[in-house]
UniProtKB/Swiss-Prot annotation:
Keywords per UniProt: Cell cycle, Cell division, Centromere, Chromosome, Chromosome partition, Kinetochore, Lysosome, Membrane, Mitosis, mRNA transport, Nuclear pore complex, Nucleus, Protein transport, Repeat, Translocation, Transport, WD repeat
WD repeats: 10-49, 55-96, 111-152, 160-210, 217-258, 276-315
Protein name: Nucleoporin SEH1-B
Similarity field: Belongs to the WD repeat SEC13 family.
Source organism of the structure: Xenopus laevis (African clawed frog)
Oligomer and partners: Component of the Nup107-160 subcomplex of the nuclear pore complex (NPC). The Nup107-160 subcomplex includes NUP160, NUP133, NUP107, NUP98, NUP85, NUP43, NUP37, SEH1 and SEC13. Component of the GATOR2 subcomplex, composed of MIOS, SEC13, SEH1L, WDR24 and WDR59. The GATOR2 complex interacts with CASTOR1 and CASTOR2; the interaction is negatively regulated by arginine. The GATOR2 complex interacts with SESN1, SESN2 and SESN3; the interaction is negatively regulated by amino acids.
Single biological process term from Gene Ontology: cell division
Signal peptide: none
Gene: seh1l-b
């Protein structure tokens, strides 16, 4: 059974994002109070705030961890039109701060002219790369050519999406059969604009990102988007948080059916669509195997979704904002799966305060 622990975050305004590190033992939160806090889990499983600092001059929308292979590195993005990269430094043995850690700003990315609404590190097999998206509809991809020098980042790609961007997700697949891919969601409120999820794929020939797909069935504002971890699947699974929860599969068509040397074409299917939240859905997050999806909405609940052996998705559990299960929703369903979902689940639980974001 999942055990809920309430954390007094002590932010002075709305918490917009919660992010766990690779091992699930560190957590970062960000808020409209312009600060980021880092939390560490102790041996008794309690969370303690080990760092808190003012990061931006506006609301901080998102915070994300780099893979630990690159050190203890965070990125944040803000209404102040910037993204920032932070690194944790531990005092040297001859330092009066011996053994104590503090976070240092390594760079500020200032290319956007509007609010930077999301920031995500690329999968580690791509090297130390970072993507941002902005309200002006531009996705920017940066690279740190020297992973030992995080003050130097070069802008590698600019992708114009033509719609205001609210969220991005890298495809985590490390298979050589899959080119690097990034999904972009738009929170444009115009009901006349269809296709508020766009998929961009890296083309080795042109060395640029090109639009591979537009999910035309998504016409409502998108708040979050997440590719599922790909453990040997030949297709991709994408979750979308909008006025409901949607799960899509993207099956690559054979190369001879795609344009020669061009982007991959996909056969897309909506495999699940749930309006159980009866409200806006703000966050979606997968467990590490890509088999359980957690979603959080303005109804104050986190809902867990899983497919059965027939690939039919259904709700397998509901948690209220205080972490308690609703009714007997978990009984006899989970076995060990809930533990594997807990990181994404906690992420969603804490993300329920995201309603009303995008204001300074």
């Amino acid at each position: 059974m999942f055990v809920a622990r309430s954390i007094a975050a002590d932010h002075k305004d709305l918490i917009h994002d919660v992010s766990f590190d690779f091992h699930g033992r560190r957590m970062a939160t960000c808020s409209s109070d312009q600060s980021v806090k880092v939390w560490d889990k102790s041996e008794n499983v309690n969370w303690h705030c080990t760092a808190s600092w003012k990061t931006h001059s506006g609301s901080v929308w998102r915070v994300t961890w780099a893979h630990p292979e690159f050190g203890q590195v965070l990125a944040s993005c803000s209404f102040d039109r910037t993204a920032a990269v932070w690194e944790e430094i531990v005092g040297e043995s001859n330092d009066k701060l011996r053994g104590q850690s503090h976070w240092v700003k390594r760079t500020t990315l200032v290319d956007s002219r509007t609010s930077v609404t999301d920031v995500k590190f690329a999968p580690k097999h791509m090297g130390l790369m970072l993507a941002t998206c902005s309200a002006d509809g531009v996705v920017r991809i940066y690279e740190a050519p020297d992973v030992m020098n995080l003050s130097q980042w070069s802008l590698q790609h600019e992708i114009s999406c033509k719609l205001s961007c609210s969220c991005i997700s890298w495809n985590p697949s490390s298979s050589r059969a899959h080119s690097p891919m990034i999904a972009v969601g738009s929170d444009d409120s115009s009901p006349n604009i269809m296709g508020k999820v766009q998929i961009y794929e890296y083309n080795e020939n042109t060395r640029k990102y090109a639009k591979a797909e537009t999910l035309m069935s998504v016409s409502d504002p998108v708040h979050d988007i997440a590719f599922a971890p790909n453990l040997g699947r030949s297709f991709h699974i994408l979750a979308v948080a909008t006025k409901d929860v949607r799960i899509f599969t993207m099956k690559p068509l054979r190369k001879e059916l795609s344009s020669s040397g061009g982007v991959t074409k996909f056969e897309n299917h909506t495999v699940a669509q749930f309006d159980n939240h009866n409200s806006q859905v703000w966050r979606v997050s997968w467990n590490i195997t890509g088999t359980v999806l957690a979603s959080s909405g303005d109804d104050g609940t986190v809902r867990l979704w899983k497919a059965n052996y027939m690939d039919n998705w259904k709700c397998i559990g509901v948690l209220k904002g205080d972490g308690n299960p609703v009714g007997n929703s978990f009984q006899g369903i989970f076995g060990s799966s809930i533990g594997s979902a807990s990181h994404g689940l906690q992420n969603s639980v804490n993300g329920t305060s995201t309603s009303g974001r995008k204001h300074s």
